[in-house]
Amino acid sequence: MLVSAKEMLEKAKAGHYAVGQFNINNLEWTKAILQTAQELNSPVILGVSEGAGKYMCGFKTVADMVKAMIGELKITVPVALHLDHGTYEGCYKCIKAGFSSIMFDGSHYPIAENVEKTRELVHVASQLGLSLEAEVGAIGGEEDGVVGMGECADPNECKMIADLGVTMLAAGIGNIHGKYPANWAGLSFDTLAAVSEKVGAMPLVLHGGTGIPADQIKKAISLGVSKINVNTECQLAFAAATREYIEAGKDLAGKGFDPRKLLAPGVEAIKATVKEKMELFGSVGKA
């Protein structure tokens, strides 16, 4: 059964750990993440970008697949199915499709319009028992063709959005999607501390979790980050393991070309990455 992310993130905030959001791209990705969460007794959030939703034949297909897999795999840990960086229209599509959590990314709107649209979605989500994430300050890098510069959020604007009643808030603190460049300055902990002070008990979200050093992850959690998003790292691990399998000629031996065999090393690589992150975030055994 899918659940809202509200309770798991409130527990994480109170317990000084973070829940991982791992983005899914297909059945193999979903299975690997769910099995690892169950094995480690950790709550988990499955993230779906609008691009990935389209790739997987629509949000309803995704929601139905995830619900069926939770039953088939006998998953008992809390699982939230979450729209990642949703447009206003995308949020409504996911609500209709049966997602348990949505993110409205209004960071590219003027703050007044971001507030107006977020307020409306807060009302709808709360009526349906769904969790809602909002964003202030664009996250850097590229996400489904949208390029952000890696801004630092204005703590006062963060409070304005938090006060609308969202479940969690993603504040830009110099983080970016994808690989971090060699000259990256690191997370702005001054910004994070100021935002945390303004929003109080609200769980904060760190996007672009790939490539952030472990000490910075731990410091971010100590300053109120309760949800950390990981996508690129799983993609890189999957690609490297698949490449190794093919370059070793294993696809040419026996039935090694069978997609179930060809994709297996990549799936194991995703599991290893998810396990490493859950241990780092402190969510193991917290289901």
Regions found by a protein language model. Give the residues of each.
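A short N-terminal beta->alpha junction/helix N-cap motif
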Residues: 17-25, 50-54, 261, 265
